[in-house]
Amino acid sequence: MDGPFAEPTNTREAILGAAFRALRKHGYASVTIQRIGDEFDKSPSLVYHHYDGKDDLLVDLMGFLLDEFEASISDSGDPPPVGGGDSQPVDESAPERSARDELDIYLTAAVDPASLDGAYAPDAQFVTVMTELRAQAANDEAYREHFDRSDRVFGEYLERLVREAAAETEAPDGHAAGASPPSVPVEEVVATLQTFATGGMFRWTTTNGGAWVDDSRAGIDGYLERVLPLVETDEAD
């Protein structure tokens, strides 16, 4: 499975493609430069020429994938298939998904990725690998800097979705006394969703599932139903 590296345009992309395949096959702990070289159709020595070690290469791989994601949402507003899984071609005749639908996909991908199908379903093995990589940020500054940037990129994407979903939602009725409920900053909602997703991914990859999946989704869905009508939809100047 090559994902976004099916047709590399240069040596860097070919090496990153080899790293992508090796990482999915072996996982973070067992992947080595040698195993990455085994997936490379040129001399493995080129890998050592371009990168100081495994982590240097994997951080560059994550940066490339994040660049691809950022470009895709800038161009079309829709994210690409996560991890380049065996996804189906996008059905152009299918109804356009609402912002709320996109939020549902994002949240489900975090706590139950295997339940999704279709063109934008995440690849469950890739989700596991990304969780392994995020764990490296606890002790490695290069990984930490990458995930700081990743959180910013996904946060901007979610902010747009939350604003659009809020605009699609009917405003709440005023209280009996005539006062409207206080508004909720969009940044607060985005931070809540990102924290839910990050924690959900870690729990999904490190447990055998259970009632917590449905219970957590019910909880976050209830939160969104309550909070979306209160979100400030106007962007700050």
Model-predicted regions and their roles:
Residues 1-10, 80-91, 171-180, 232-237:
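N-terminal intrinsically disordered/low-complexity leader segments
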Residues 3, 8-14, 18-64:
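Helix-turn-helix
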Residues 11, 54, 61, 65, ...:
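Hydrophobic/aromatic residues within well-ordered alpha-helical segments
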Residues 16, 155-159, 163, 190, ...:
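An amphipathic alpha-helix signature
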Residues 60, 74-127, 186-193:
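Hydrophobic alpha-helical connector segments
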Residues 136-141:
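Short loop-to-helix capping motifs
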Residues 142-148, 152, 167-237:
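Hydrophobic/aromatic-rich alpha-helical bundle segments in the mid-to-C-terminal region
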